[in-house]
C-alpha cells in the first residue's frame, strides 16, 4: 500500500481581508457547535483549538449584540443509537453535559438555537426559513470544526445563495492541513470571504 503525502510548502496562500464591514440588519453570525463535547477539555471529542478560539468568538458576539445582529447557535444533537456513533463514538447526546454550549459562549435571550443531527446546519432544519424571514443575506461563520461541520454549513449556505464570511482565527481545526483544505474549499468552491481576525469584523 502506498501513501499520499502533500507538499505543504507548495500550497498557495489564500486571500484574506484585514477588515470587513457588514450591514447589521442583513447579517447573521452562525456559531457552529461550540459545545462542551468539542471545546471543553473533559469533552469526548475535545479539540484544543476549539477552546483557543473562544475569546475571538466572544469579541465578535459582543459587537454583534450591540448592533442587534441575528445570532444563531448550532448544536450537534444526537440520540442513543445514532449511526454516527459508529464513526465518532457516542457524543453530544441531547440534554447531556457534552451537548451543552460552553459556559463562556452561552446563548442569550433572543438568540436562535438550531439542533442538527448531521454536519450541515441547513440539513433537515429550519435555519434557511428563519434567515429568509429576517431577510438575511450575509453569514459570518465561526466554530468547530473546520473541515467537517463548518465546511458543510458553508456549503449549505452557498447552495442557498448566502454570502459567507469566515474569520480565520475563530475556526477550530484538527490540524493545519485540514484547516487549509477547508478554507481552500470554502473560498475556491463556495466563494467565501476569509477575514484575518474575528475582531476585525464590524457591523453598521
What does each model-found stretch correspond to?
Residues 32, 75, 168:
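Active-site flanking residues adjacent to catalytic metal/cofactor-binding acidic residues
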Residues 71, 76-89:
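Early exported N-terminus immediately downstream of N-terminal targeting peptides
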Residues 1-28, 62-66, 90-204:
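Active-site-adjacent betaalpha module
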Residues 17, 38-39:
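Active-site gating/metal-coordination segments in enzymes
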Residues 25, 43-75:
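A short alpha/beta connector and helix-capping loop motif
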Residues 36, 79, 172:
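Short, glycine/acidic-enriched loop or turn micro-motifs at the edges of active sites
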Residues 2-8, 40-48:
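Acidic/histidine-rich helix-loop elements
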Residues 28-38:
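Acidic-leg catalytic submotif of subtilisin-like serine proteases
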Amino acid at each position: 500500500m502506498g501513501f499520499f503525502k502533500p507538499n505543504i510548502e507548495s500550497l498557495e496562500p489564500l486571500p484574506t481581508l484585514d477588515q470587513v464591514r457588514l450591514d447589521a440588519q442583513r447579517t447573521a453570525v452562525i456559531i457552529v457547535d461550540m459545545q462542551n463535547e468539542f471545546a471543553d477539555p473533559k469533552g469526548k471529542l475535545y479539540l484544543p483549538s476549539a477552546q483557543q478560539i473562544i475569546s475571538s468568538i466572544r469579541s465578535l458576539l459582543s459587537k454583534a449584540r450591540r448592533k442587534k445582529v441575528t445570532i444563531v447557535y448550532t448544536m450537534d444533537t444526537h440520540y442513543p443509537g445514532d449511526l454516527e456513533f459508529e464513526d465518532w463514538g457516542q457524543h453530544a447526546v441531547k440534554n447531556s453535559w457534552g451537548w451543552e454550549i460552553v459556559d463562556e459562549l452561552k446563548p442569550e435571550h433572543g438568540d436562535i438555537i438550531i439542533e442538527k443531527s448531521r454536519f450541515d446546519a441547513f440539513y433537515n432544519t429550519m435555519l434557511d426559513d428563519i434567515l429568509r424571514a429576517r431577510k438575511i443575506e450575509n453569514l459570518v461563520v465561526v466554530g468547530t470544526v473546520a473541515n467537517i461541520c463548518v465546511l458543510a454549513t458553508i456549503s449549505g449556505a452557498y447552495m442557498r445563495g448566502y454570502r459567507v464570511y469566515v474569520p480565520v482565527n475563530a475556526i477550530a481545526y484538527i490540524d493545519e492541513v485540514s484547516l487549509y483544505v477547508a478554507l481552500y474549499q470554502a473560498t475556491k468552491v463556495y466563494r467565501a470571504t476569509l477575514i484575518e481576525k474575528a475582531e476585525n469584523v464590524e457591523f453598521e
